[in-house]
Structures are given as structure tokens and as C-alpha cells.
């Protein structure tokens, strides 16, 4: 990236993000994008900034950094564009493969929601970041860890209550679209519903034990409830989880067997 941005730190990056994501929707797009590239040209010392010049620079950078090719900048894409590598703590959240399964997401959630409050506090987020640095074999001072924790809270804690909910963490980890959205159960025949059930159960039965347990139940409940209520809280999830277990866990072993879930859904699974 050009030298004008090489001295940026996480707090300055936050300031730029909040300035140009004016509608607070998690993207810089449309008019915001034009204003950002105009600002970029000024920072680089350009003279006589014209709409054509802004468009040229925009095309150049978007082709290099707009990984999703959706014509807008996500926070990770902007970080890659303007933060020096040693300050780009958002690189920690890059994964070799996309996070496309709510089971793995819920495993992370349960690990760091240490007090089972249904939220990730600043202290719990700090522990999460510290573990990420260790996993990436990177050294970090306590002060820097505090700065990154504070920046993450300001970036993702939209209601400013000092803690992250399920949706905030889903944004941080770039959780992919709800797996259940691809299925139209109401419009299907009985055979199609049985086939879909097999696919759905296999997706959430990550451990391949023939039963959903722990984060597998959590992931299924999260996706199922978000079909009707797009933003559920950790507290809501725990309530819905207990309702599902009360209804489906016939033998009371704390798991949902494949046959138990099929019975709940009014299906007879394939043997």
C-alpha cells in the first residue's frame, strides 16, 4: 500500500472506517466509496482531483482488494488495503477455508462465553484475541492487546453495551449464509423432505456419531431460529435450545438422535 498509510494504527483505522461507513451497515459502498477514494487521493497528495481520476483509482484498488467482487468494501478488505501488516490484526480472522458451518461457530462461541451469559464481554474478547495471536505464533504486548480489544468492541458492538452478541461475533468471523436457507420444506413432497432431512442432519452431525450434541445442537438451533427471527441473541439461543431438547430428546441423554429429530419433524428417516 502507498506510503501515506504506512503509519496507520488500529485506532486510526477505526476512525477512517467509522467516517466512511456513514450508514453503519458494515460496508463502504456507493457514495461512501467515492468519498473514500477522494480522501485517499488527497492523502496521497494528488492535485486537481476529478471524478475521472477518482474512478480510475477506485477501479485500480477495487480490482485488487474487493475479494468478494460485490462492488463494496468490507472491513477486512479495507484493512488489507490501508493497514500495514504488523498492525492488521484483522488478518487473524482469515481462515484457510470460509466459516460455513454454524457448528464450528458455536464451538467458538461456547468456548469464549466463559460465564455462559449469552454475551462475549471485553475480557472474554481479549482472551479470544490472545489465543488467536498464540495460534498465529505472534508476540503481542498487553497494551497492544488492550488496544485491539477496544478497537474490536468499537467496530462490532453496534449497540454500544460493551459486549458482543451472537450477531457481532458472526460478523467478526464472517460466518457464511445460513445453511438451511437453501431448503424449502413447506413446498416439498414427503420424499424430498426425507432427502433434505438426510442432507441437513449430515451437515450438523459434524462428529458423525448419528446424534447432535453440544455445539452441533447449538448450530442447528441457531440456523433454524434465524429462519424466522434473523437476529437472535445468545440468551434466546439457550432458551430455544432447551425447548428443542425438551421436545426431541426422548431418552434424555442430552443429545438429539437422528431418529428423535426425524420424529420431531414428522419424518421417518432412511435406515
Swiss-Prot record:
Residues 8-43, 52-88, 100-135, 144-179, 192-227, 235-271 form the EF-hand domain. It comes from the Eukaryota. GO terms for molecular function: calcium ion binding. Disulfide bonds: none annotated. Keywords: Calcium, Cytoplasm, Metal-binding, Repeat. It is found in: Cytoplasm. Coiled coil: none annotated. CDD domains: EFh_HEF_SCGN (cd16178). Ca(2+) 5 binds at residues 249, 251, 253, 255, 260. Gene3D superfamilies: EF-hand. Its main location: cytoplasm. InterPro entries: Calbindin_Ca-bind, EF-hand-dom_pair, EF_Hand_1_Ca_BS, EF_hand_dom, EFh_SCGN. This is Secretagogin. The gene is scgn. Ca(2+) 4 binds at residues 205, 207, 209, 216. GO terms for cellular component: cytoplasm. Ca(2+) 2 binds at residues 113, 115, 117, 124. Pfam families: EF-hand_5, EF-hand_7. Ca(2+) 3 binds at residues 159, 161, 163, 168. Ca(2+) 1 binds at residues 21, 23, 25, 27, 32. Signal peptide: none annotated.
Amino acid at each position: 500500500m502507498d506510503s501515506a498509510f504506512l503509519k496507520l494504527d488500529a485506532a486510526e483505522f477505526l476512525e477512517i472506517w467509522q467516517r466512511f461507513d456513514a450508514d453503519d451497515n458494515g460496508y463502504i459502498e456507493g457514495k461512501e466509496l467515492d468519498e473514500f477514494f477522494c480522501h485517499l487521493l488527497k492523502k496521497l497528495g494528488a492535485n486537481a482531483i476529478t471524478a475521472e481520476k477518482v474512478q480510475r483509482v477506485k477501479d485500480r484498488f477495487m480490482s485488487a482488494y474487493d475479494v468478494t467482487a460485490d462492488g463494496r468494501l468490507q472491513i477486512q478488505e479495507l484493512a488489507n488495503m490501508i493497514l500495514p501488516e504488523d498492525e492488521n490484526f484483522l488478518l487473524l480472522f482469515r481462515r484457510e477455508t470460509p466459516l460455513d458451518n454454524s457448528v464450528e461457530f458455536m464451538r467458538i462461541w461456547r468456548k469464549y462465553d466463559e460465564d455462559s451469559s449469552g454475551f462475549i464481554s471485553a475480557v472474554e474478547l481479549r482472551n479470544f484475541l490472545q489465543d488467536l495471536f498464540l495460534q498465529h505464533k505472534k508476540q503481542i504486548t498487553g497494551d497492544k492487546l488492550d488496544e485491539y480489544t477496544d478497537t474490536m468492541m468499537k467496530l462490532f458492538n453496534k449497540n454500544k453495551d460493551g459486549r458482543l452478541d451472537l450477531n457481532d461475533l458472526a460478523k467478526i468471523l464472517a460466518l457464511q449464509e445460513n445453511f438451511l436457507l437453501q431448503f424449502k420444506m413447506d413446498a416439498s413432497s414427503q420424499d424430498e423432505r426425507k432427502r433434505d432431512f438426510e442432507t441437513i442432519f449430515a451437515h450438523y452431525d459434524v462428529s458423525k456419531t448419528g446424534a447432535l450434541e453440544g455445539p452441533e445442537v447449538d448450530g442447528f438451533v441457531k440456523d433454524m431460529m434465524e429462519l424466522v427471527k434473523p437476529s437472535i441473541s445468545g440468551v434466546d439461543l439457550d432458551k430455544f435450545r432447551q425447548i428443542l431438547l425438551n421436545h426431541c430428546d426422548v431418552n434424555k441423554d442430552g443429545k438429539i438422535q437422528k431418529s428423535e429429530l426425524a420424529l420431531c419433524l414428522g419424518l421417518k428417516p432412511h435406515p
